[in-house]
Swiss-Prot record:
This is Cytochrome b-c1 complex subunit 6, mitochondrial. The modification N6-acetyllysine is found at residues 40, 83. PANTHER family: CYTOCHROME B-C1 COMPLEX SUBUNIT 6, MITOCHONDRIAL, UBIQUINOL-CYTOCHROME C REDUCTASE COMPLEX 7.8 KDA PROTEIN. Keywords: Acetylation, Disulfide bond, Electron transport, Membrane, Mitochondrion, Mitochondrion inner membrane, Respiratory chain, Transit peptide, Transport. The gene is Uqcrh.
Length: 89
């Protein structure tokens, strides 16, 4: 066993293709981030954040932001549904 063989054992196979492995990125995350920037989602997020501030500022309230959360998720997921499968391999 020579020095080159030991180096391959310590660093891997020595194959540059294996050393240049790309980190996999979930396409769902990428598409969601893109969709969240669209006007409809931005407005829904603003309503959700406004509701959250309002509810958080009160010590006792029965109000919650469920409706605003579902509106935001619906808007985002509607956008995602149309774009996600185009980006899959």
């Amino acid at each position: 066993m020579g020095l080159e063989d030991e180096r391959k054992m310590l660093t891997g196979s020595g194959d540059p293709k294996e050393e240049e492995e790309e980190e996999l990125v979930d396409p769902l995350t990428t598409v969601r981030e893109h969709c969240e920037q669209l006007e409809k989602c931005v407005k829904a997020r603003e309503r959700l954040e406004s509701c959250d501030r309002r509810v958080s500022s009160r010590s006792q309230t029965e109000e919650d932001c469920t409706e605003e959360l579902f509106d935001f998720l619906h808007a985002r997921d509607h956008c995602v549904a149309h774009k996600l499968f185009k980006s899959l391999k």
